[in-house]
Design a protein with these regions (language model features):
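Glycine-rich beta-strand-centered segment in the early N-terminal region that forms part
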Residues: 9-59, 100-102
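Residue-level preference for short coil/turn positions at secondary-structure junctions
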Residues: 39-40, 92, 127, 151
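Small/polar loops that bind or transfer phosphate-bearing groups
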Residues: 20, 47, 111, 135, ...
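NAD(P)H dinucleotide-binding glycine-rich loop of Rossmann-like/cofactor-binding domains
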Residues: 54-134
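Short Gly/aromatic-enriched secondary-structure transition segments
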Residues: 2-7
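Hydrophobic/small residue at the entry helix of a nucleotide-binding pocket
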Residues: 115, 139, 147
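Adenosine-nucleotide cofactor-binding segment
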Residues: 133-136, 144, 148-170
Length: 170
């Protein structure tokens, strides 16, 4: 939303036209010859993270720690990395997770929800505790849901936008 509304965030500014989007799901239309466990027509959530497979972390099998990770819809490098909000997107099989039983909208929320679930895991003992969530945009709102699910006794949400707070409160 920051790219769309403000042309960037902080020091990161758009310097060329860029397709937005890193929250993505889609139906598989074609599969490569070596791909297993995915089917044409299947709905998948797509991870926006693409490791370099060249740094020390990647070479040791720890791609999640890649120091050159590329993310769909990022203006950090130049040229920018185009986003996933398009009709056709070619992805690697490791980026796809079956979203059977979900709508495409729900499947697209897998990445932001994963951010929130990771935060809950890092916080450790949430059950019965007071939790502060700073910012009630899409991620903050999902964090409210995750904190509720984890059994937080009280959830306090802050934001500079009254509209965002009202939405988070519901």
């Amino acid at each position: 939303l920051h790219y769309y509304k403000h042309g960037g965030f902080g020091q990161i500014k758009l310097r060329e036209p860029m397709i937005l989007g890193h929250e993505v799901s889609g139906f598989i239309s074609k599969i490569g010859s070596n791909v297993e466990n995915l089917l044409v027509g299947q709905l998948v959530s797509v991870s926006p993270s693409r490791p370099c497979n060249k740094c020390n972390f990647c070479l040791s099998g720890n791609q999640i720690q890649c120091i050159n990770m590329k993310f769909y819809g990022s203006a950090m490098p130049f040229p920018h990395i185009q986003g996933a909000f398009r009709e056709i997107l070619i992805v690697e099989d490791y980026q796809c997770v079956s979203a059977d039983g979900l709508s495409s909208e729900e499947a697209a929320m897998a990445e932001p929800l994963a951010v929130c679930l990771h935060a809950i895991k890092q916080a450790d003992k949430i059950f019965g505790q007071k939790v502060l969530i700073t910012g009630s945009g899409p991620i903050g709102t999902l964090c409210v849901a995750a904190a509720r699910r984890a059994g937080a006794e009280e959830i306090i949400v802050t934001d500079i936008s009254t509209n965002a707070l009202t939405f988070s409160d519901s």
